[in-house]
């Protein structure tokens, strides 16, 4: 099986590009006849027949037999061969990793979540990331050479086309994707985490079929993914979606981006954590008091757990964050938007303040 045309961004031959488009069509639409592919791609039947035949020879496409019809010649149905290749996905959070492997049709084979990991802008943290990915791959009943690529979600400013991350792991001149490829020996793609989530929601989520959406991701930080006319909007150098860094408050709180008063300073997981510490020091009570007193690490999962256990201080602050977020969203002129707040099951704590009349 040859994978050169599939993985190379330099293969600009007409045949290579059309083969990629055919594979993308089957990934998005499932099994289909040659006539259906021709109609969608505006290509002739001889051209598509030849390309699909070559993809069959390479092992990417299978012939699933004749389609049942009411009359006339029965066309063959073709679809992706699920075992022809695999893709690994890596989601990097502030204090954990989520890893998954999908077959060539996009079906999940295995998912491992909440793997302990500390995200830091250091070579040691990058090496630890590679160790975790290697351990996951080595545990799979799949030959390493059948993994076609690894997609890695990273927070902050990411240029997916050049392979650079400008917010984390930016201590070398080379693109981060190249550094990771040298360490893992597998093709690497990096992308902003919120943009990836937005695209996944567009393909399979509650807004499937809509062409224009905003995806708002509230985790330790705050960002948005933008879909315009069915396409991901990247902006200049891939820096679109920095919603959390609009100048919004007169609070003199220094954001990690270097500015003061960013929306993220009052509407994010880091804002929840900072405000919780401030209120506790002022005399408020919380079930996280013992951890605070002991100087233990408190991550987003600890804050979420406190909310689920109905810690009143955490809930009160979460409601304030919801109200702040609503004020920010009110300025976004869009018909459909999706809000993701990591693992919060009782949405009423923050959704109701977010949707107050004076906001939305």
Report the location of each language-model feature.
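ATP-binding/phosphotransfer module of carbohydrate and carboxylate kinases, centering on a glycine-rich
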Residues: 1-64, 69-72, 77-113, 117-145, ...
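Hydrophobic beta-strand positions
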Residues: 101, 157-158, 226
């Amino acid at each position: 099986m040859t994978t050169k045309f599939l993985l190379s961004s330099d293969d600009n031959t007409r045949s290579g590009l059309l083969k990629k488009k055919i594979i993308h069509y089957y990934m998005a639409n499932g099994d289909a006849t040659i006539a259906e592919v021709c109609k969608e791609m505006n290509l002739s039947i001889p051209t598509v027949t030849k390309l699909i035949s070559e993809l069959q020879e390479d092992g990417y496409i299978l012939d699933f037999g004749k389609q049942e019809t009411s009359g006339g010649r029965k066309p063959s149905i073709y679809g992706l061969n699920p075992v022809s290749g695999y893709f690994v996905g890596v989601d990097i959070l502030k204090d954990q990793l989520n890893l998954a492997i999908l077959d060539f049709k996009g079906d999940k084979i295995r998912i491992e979540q909440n793997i302990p990991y500390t995200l830091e802008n250091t070579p040691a943290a990058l090496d630890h990331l590679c160790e975790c990915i290697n351990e996951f791959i080595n545990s799979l009943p799949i030959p390493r050479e059948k993994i076609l690529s690894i997609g890695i979600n990273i927070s902050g400013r990411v240029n997916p086309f050049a392979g650079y991350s400008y917010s984390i792991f930016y201590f070398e001149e080379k693109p981060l994707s190249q550094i990771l490829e040298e360490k893992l020996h597998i093709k690497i793609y990096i992308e902003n985490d919120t943009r990836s989530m937005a695209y996944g929601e567009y393909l399979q989520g509650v807004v499937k079929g809509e062409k224009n959406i905003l995806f708002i991701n509230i985790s330790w930080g705050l960002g948005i993914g933008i879909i315009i006319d069915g396409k991901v909007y990247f902006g200049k150098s891939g820096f679109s979606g920095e919603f959390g860094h609009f100048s919004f408050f007169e609070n003199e709180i220094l954001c990690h981006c270097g500015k003061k008063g960013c929306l993220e300073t009052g509407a994010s997981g880091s804002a929840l954590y900072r405000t919780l510490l401030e209120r506790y020091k002022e005399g408020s009570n919380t079930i996280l008091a013992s951890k605070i007193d002991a100087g233990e690490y408190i991550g987003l999962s600890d804050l979420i757990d406190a909310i689920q256990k109905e810690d009143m201080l955490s809930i009160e602050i979460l409601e304030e964050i919801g109200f702040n977020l609503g004020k920010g969203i009110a300025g976004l002129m869009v018909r459909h938007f999706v809000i993701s707040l990591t693992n919060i099951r009782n949405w009423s704590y923050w959704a109701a303040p977010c949707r107050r009349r004076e906001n939305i």
